[in-house]
UniProtKB/Swiss-Prot annotation:
<dbReference type="GO" id="GO:0009252">
    <property type="term" value="P:peptidoglycan biosynthetic process"/>
</dbReference>
<keyword id="KW-0131">Cell cycle</keyword>
<feature type="transmembrane region" description="Helical">
    <location>
        <begin position="90"/>
        <end position="110"/>
    </location>
</feature>
<protein>
    <recommendedName>
        <fullName>Probable peptidoglycan glycosyltransferase FtsW</fullName>
        <ecNumber>2.4.99.28</ecNumber>
    </recommendedName>
</protein>
<feature type="topological domain" description="Cytoplasmic">
    <location>
        <begin position="410"/>
        <end position="524"/>
    </location>
</feature>
<keyword id="KW-0133">Cell shape</keyword>
<feature type="topological domain" description="Cytoplasmic">
    <location>
        <position position="234"/>
    </location>
</feature>
<dbReference type="GO" id="GO:0051301">
    <property type="term" value="P:cell division"/>
</dbReference>
<keyword id="KW-0812">Transmembrane</keyword>
<feature type="topological domain" description="Extracellular">
    <location>
        <begin position="374"/>
        <end position="388"/>
    </location>
</feature>
<keyword id="KW-1003">Cell membrane</keyword>
<feature type="topological domain" description="Cytoplasmic">
    <location>
        <begin position="333"/>
        <end position="350"/>
    </location>
</feature>
<feature type="transmembrane region" description="Helical">
    <location>
        <begin position="152"/>
        <end position="172"/>
    </location>
</feature>
<keyword id="KW-0961">Cell wall biogenesis/degradation</keyword>
<feature type="transmembrane region" description="Helical">
    <location>
        <begin position="56"/>
        <end position="76"/>
    </location>
</feature>
<dbReference type="Pfam" id="PF01098">
    <property type="entry name" value="FTSW_RODA_SPOVE"/>
</dbReference>
<feature type="topological domain" description="Cytoplasmic">
    <location>
        <begin position="173"/>
        <end position="191"/>
    </location>
</feature>
Length: 524
């Protein structure tokens, strides 16, 4: 009996030393840890890392670095043959891509250091400048025509596409506009009137080039802004229908675009002309197999597949890196989607929340369209694969937007609290970034949030007592309205106004499910 008691005491002592969930003396435990110790700490190291304040910032920087590095490697591999044929050197296209990547890194660093208030202040001016650039590029002698589209400026041998800058400026200005109008509880008309006409002007200028791919990309940005702003579903569906119908009309209006659509519907109709690119891209993907032919060992780039370094670089990735490399690239874009939506849902500023979600949708939509027409699911539109294809202005604009997303990650409430409490980050010290400012909502939004958190019960008005009239005394002498001929037991129905603004006054302010999904902590 004594031996059993000694063994039991020894096991209890060992168990108390190994159990880490029990609080020890001197250790502070919060109310949540005391009530539910299992949920206070993550079970794995990966879960603990995801719960750190700067995890979103590290994730977006790492994903952008991996995509940019992979893009530079594949541009060098896919463009060496064409560069040597055109200029006698295999490094020309790759060198230009490196220079544009440096420009994008500088732009991303500037956006990373920029304050949110200054960004919103210059949003409209930046969009207006890009509209002027879209007008100038249509002037003969100023804009350069390539591949049937007049949409480039050429300066010192470097080409710049103003439509890429217009998309970036429109996303920033649209997020600023919708965030401000949503705070003021503006009507649906007031929310749509500045945004949609401005988008129509930009789309019309891009269509005049003409450029179907950039038109579709601008439509994605507009739909993303409308969707994540929480507008009514009928407004979003009508906008989606308008964008789809416009894209369909543009696809069959011009000769080369209609040829692409016909070749997509029937690839065997003209395999040597309009369907040649799509056919060769499928051959390259099939040639790669599971593990690919090896980096730099592809055959399609030897003048078999036109624009192998640009629009159809995903086919070269599938040929040289195989199915494994293609799935790895898709995994990187999936990680980018998770990171962008994580930052959007954790942001306290409505402007950063809306801009981050829209930008994430834009990059993913463009990647989906590019990969879709390479593998044959969509007709060829000419959209580039973000951060992978050889496109100078596209790469610079995308890196600048990633700088804005990283800036939003630093403005998460937990990140702001950690950085301002002195728990600095190595990456922040290396980049010499300033401390982020906590989000301070306007007084109107703060008052509305307090009213929403503490709703007041509806007060019932007491029934008004009517004086009794003496028998034979008229009601007019008692100060009462004359009685009608027929008795009335209830108040007459109030006729409501049928003015269009009455029903739409606060139609844009309904907290839909997609808005609640992006609602993070409101105050930093």
């Amino acid at each position: 009996m004594l031996t059993r008691l000694l063994r039991r005491g020894t096991s209890d002592t060992d168990g108390s030393q190994t159990r880490g969930a029990e609080p020890v003396e001197g250790q502070r435990t919060g109310p949540e840890e005391a009530s539910n110790p299992g949920s206070a700490r993550p079970r794995t190291r990966f879960g603990a890392w995801l719960g750190r304040p700067m995890t979103s910032f590290h994730l977006i920087i790492a994903v952008a670095a991996l995509l940019t590095t992979l893009g530079l490697i594949m541009v060098l591999s896919a463009s060496a043959v064409r560069s040597y044929d055109d200029d006698g050197s295999a490094w020309v296209i790759f060198g230009k891509q490196v220079l544009w990547t440096l420009v994008g890194l500088i732009g991303g660093y500037v956006c990373l250091r920029m304050s949110v208030r200054f960004m919103r202040r210059i949003a409209f001016s930046g969009f207006a400048i890009t509209i002027v650039m879209l007008v100038l590029v249509l002037v003969p002698g100023i804009g350069k025509e390539a591949n049937g589209s007049r949409g480039w400026f050429v300066v010192a041998g470097f080409s710049m596409q103003p439509s890429e800058l217009a998309k970036m400026a429109f996303a920033i200005w649209g997020a600023h506009l919708l965030a401000a109008r949503r705070m003021e509880r503006a009507s649906l008309r007031e929310m749509l009137i500045p945004l949609v006409p401005a988008a129509v002007v930009a789309l019309a200028l891009i269509v005049a080039q003409p450029d179907l791919g950039q038109t579709v990309s601008m439509g994605i940005i507009l739909l993303g802004l409308l969707w994540y702003a929480g507008l009514p579903l009928r407004v979003f569906l009508s906008s989606l229908a308008a964008v789809v119908v416009s894209a369909a009309i543009l696809a069959v209006s011009a000769g080369y675009r209609s040829d692409r659509v016909r070749s997509w519907l029937n690839p065997e109709n003209d395999p040597q002309d309009s369907g040649y690119q799509a056919r060769q891209a499928k051959f390259a993907l099939a040639q790669g197999g599971i593990f690919g032919d090896g980096l730099g060992q592809g055959v399609a780039k030897w003048n078999y597949l036109p624009n192998a370094h640009n629009d159809f670089i995903f086919a070269i990735i599938g040929e040289e890196l195989g199915l494994v490399g293609a799935l790895g690239l898709l995994g990187l874009f999936g990680l980018f989607a998770y990171t962008g939506m994580r930052i959007a849902s954790r942001s306290a500023d409505p402007f950063l929340r809306l801009l981050t979600a829209t930008t994430t949708l834009w990059v993913l939509g463009q990647a989906f369209i590019n990969i879709g027409y390479v593998i044959g699911l969509l007709p060829v539109t000419g959209l580039q694969l973000p951060l992978i294809s050889a496109g100078g202005t596209s790469t610079a604009a995308t890196l600048s937007l990633i700088g804005i997303i990283a800036n939003a990650a630093r403005h998460e409430p937990e990140a702001v609290a950690a950085l301002r409490a002195g728990r600095d980050d190595k990456v922040n010290r290396l980049l010499r970034l300033p401390l982020p400012e906590p989000y301070l909502p306007p007084r109107l939004e703060a008052f509305r949030d307090r009213k929403r958190a503490n709703p007041q019960p509806a007060q019932t008005q007491p029934a008004r007592k009517t004086p009794r009239t003496a028998p034979g005394q008229p009601a007019r002498q008692m100060g009462l309205p004359p009685r009608p001929g027929s008795p009335r037991t209830a108040d007459p129905p109030v006729r409501r106004s049928v003015h269009h603004g009455a029903g739409q006054r606060y139609a844009g302010q309904r907290r839909t499910r997609r808005v609640r999904a992006l609602e993070g902590q409101r105050y930093g």
